[in-house]
Amino acid sequence: TSDKSTECYRNWWPGPGDDMVALMNRSIDLMESHAKDSDNVFLLNRRGYLFATANPEMADKFALQASEAESLGAGPLRHITNGALYRPASAHGFENGLDGADLITDKDIINVHFPYINPEAVAVLHARRCGSLSAQQMGMYLLERTRENGGELFSAELIGVETSAGRVTSVVLEAAGDVIEIRTDNIVLSTGPYMKVCAALLGIDLPVAVEKHIKISLSDPYRAIPREAPLIFWAD
C-alpha cells in the first residue's frame, strides 16, 4: 500500500515460479520509463537492498537465494572476491544501475564499502534492481498525465461489480449517499489490504492474507547511516 509505505521497490522475490519477478521487472520498466519522461520528478533511485549477516550458515543461504533469484530472472549473481570489481550504487538516479546481486564474503571488502554495518558481518548480499522513490510524487505525476489524457478522478466506495458470462459489465459505486452504476469492460483493483474483499465482489476468492508490519523511526543525529545507503536488512 502507499498509506504508510516504505516507498521502496524490488525485483528480488523467491519462487516457486517467476511470477513476482516477472511482474516487478515489468513494473520497474514502466517506472523507469515514467522517470525518464518526467526528468525523474519522483526521485527514483537504484541503491539496492543490502542483506547482512554475522552467521556463516546464513552466508551460504545468501548464495542459494541469489542463485534462485538469478534462475527466476532477477539478474546474475556476482561473487565479489576482489574489491575493485564491486561497483557501488549511485546515490541518485537509476540509469546506470546494475541488476542481479553482489555477494561479498570478504570482511575487508565489506568494511571498505559498508563501514556503517555491524563489524561482525561475514557476508553481505547486495540485490541491485531495487531502490526507493517518492511514491506520492509518482502518484501525482500519473494523475496529472491521466487528466491530460481526459481521465477524471472520482471518489466513491465500490459496493458491487456486475458481470455477465464471466466478464465485467459495470461497477456500482456509492458517493455521498447516491448509488451510481458505471458501465465498463475492465476494472483494476489496487486496493491493498482490501484486495480479498474487493475480489469477493467479483465472486473470486483470492488466497491472500493481510500481514501486519510495524515501522519505527529513530533519530540519527550522528548520521551513523549515510543518507545514500541501500535499504539494509540484518538477516540474523
Regions found by a protein language model. Give the residues of each.
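Flavin-dependent oxidoreductases
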Residues: 10, 20-22, 26, 161-236
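Glycine-rich FAD pyrophosphate-binding loop
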Residues: 1-2
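Alpha-helical scaffold segments in soluble metabolic enzymes
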Residues: 30, 64, 141, 148, ...
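Helical element adjacent to the flavin cofactor pocket in flavoenzyme catalytic cores
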Residues: 118-120, 124-186, 190, 194
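Dinucleotide-binding Rossmann-like beta1-alpha1 core, especially the glycine-rich loop
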Residues: 7-109, 113
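Short hydrophobic/aromatic beta-strand or adjacent loop that forms the aromatic wall/cage
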Residues: 49, 122-124, 211-215
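Short amphipathic alpha-helical/adjacent loop interface patches that line ligand
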Residues: 6, 27-28, 146, 195
